[in-house]
């Protein structure tokens, strides 16, 4: 390999390195932008979760009837009567009870 070929090879290698460096810088800027966007979205998500938690707490405080009804539905779903006639007794084969259903369907 003569000097000109060696110089041309180094020049080509140098050009390739410059192109690669430019691509890396562009990727670096893109990653930085994505990290900033991710941080903003995480903060927004945290604020929204706090707001949702606050609203849910207000809803439960304003509507204790719903909380009680949900509790009764849970007991009924576990297979127990919630009606006045058979309260606390296990339902046979998880059959529906019209008295319990009437309580759950009240508004």
From Swiss-Prot:
It is found in: Cytoplasm, Nucleoid. One of its GO terms (biological process) is DNA replication. Keywords: Cytoplasm, DNA replication, DNA replication inhibitor, Metal-binding, Zinc. The keyword Metal-binding applies. Zn(2+) binds at residues 81, 83, 97, 100. Its cofactor is Zn(2+). Its main location: cytoplasm. Pfam families: YabA. Involved in control of chromosome replication initiation. Inhibits the cooperative binding of DnaA to the oriC region, thus negatively regulating initiation of chromosome replication. Inhibits the ability of DnaA-ATP to form a helix on DNA; does not disassemble preformed DnaA-DNA helices. Decreases the residence time of DnaA on the chromosome at its binding sites (oriC, replication forks and promoter-binding sites). Tethers DnaA to the replication machinery via the DNA polymerase beta sliding clamp subunit (dnaN). NCBIfam families: PRK13169.1-1 (NF009640). HAMAP family: YabA. Homotetramer. Interacts with both DnaA and DnaN, acting as a bridge between these two proteins. This is Replication initiation control protein YabA.
